């Protein structure tokens, strides 16, 4: 994934729409699912106008707090999950190497 980044399309007090540049469903679906678990989030929409021509966008509306904070918190939670998976895999590799 080269040069992946966000572009803010629109933002107000309770909502934000973000275009995801150089991202694919592999990362975006877990992000949208994680954002939807946030109690402060009222709505989350993920859409692509045309899969070959347009970048995906997510729209987040919150009941409280800042919408960009909900996205940031979700990214941090996903990061912890993936880091935990890496740690688990490394422990398993060590365990298997010790038993040989």
Curated annotation (Swiss-Prot):
Places the protein is found: Cytoplasm
TM segment ranges: none
EC numbers, comma separated: 2.7.7.6
Primary localization: cytoplasm
UniProt entry tagged with the keyword RNA-binding: no
Keywords: Cytoplasm, DNA-directed RNA polymerase, Nucleotidyltransferase, Transcription, Transferase
Cellular component GO terms held in the UniProt record: cytoplasm; DNA-directed RNA polymerase complex
A Pfam family of this chain: RNA_pol_L_2
Record GO terms (molecular function): DNA binding; DNA-directed RNA polymerase activity; protein dimerization activity
Catalysis performed (reactions): RNA(n) + a ribonucleoside 5'-triphosphate = RNA(n+1) + diphosphate
Recorded superkingdom: Archaea
UniProt keyword Nucleotidyltransferase present: yes
Annotated InterPro entries: RBP11-like, RBP11-like_dimer, RNA_pol_Rpb11_13-16kDa_CS, Rpo11-like
GO biological process: DNA-templated transcription
Family indicated by similarity: Belongs to the archaeal Rpo11/eukaryotic RPB11/RPC19 RNA polymerase subunit family.
Subunit structure: Part of the RNA polymerase complex.
Functional summary from the UniProt entry: DNA-dependent RNA polymerase (RNAP) catalyzes the transcription of DNA into RNA using the four ribonucleoside triphosphates as substrates.
The name this protein goes by in its record: DNA-directed RNA polymerase subunit Rpo11
Gene: rpo11
């Amino acid at each position: 994934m080269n040069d992946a980044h966000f572009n803010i399309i629109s933002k107000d007090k309770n909502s934000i729409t973000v275009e995801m540049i150089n991202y694919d469903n592999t990362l975006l679906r877990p992000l949208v699912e994680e954002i939807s678990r946030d109690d402060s989030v009222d709505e989350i929409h993920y859409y692509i106008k045309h899969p070959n021509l347009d970048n995906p966008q997510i729209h987040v509306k919150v009941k409280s707090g800042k919408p960009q904070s909900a996205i940031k918190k979700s990214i941090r939670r996903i990061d912890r999950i993936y880091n935990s998976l890496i740690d688990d895999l490394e422990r398993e590799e060590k365990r298997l190497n010790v038993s040989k």
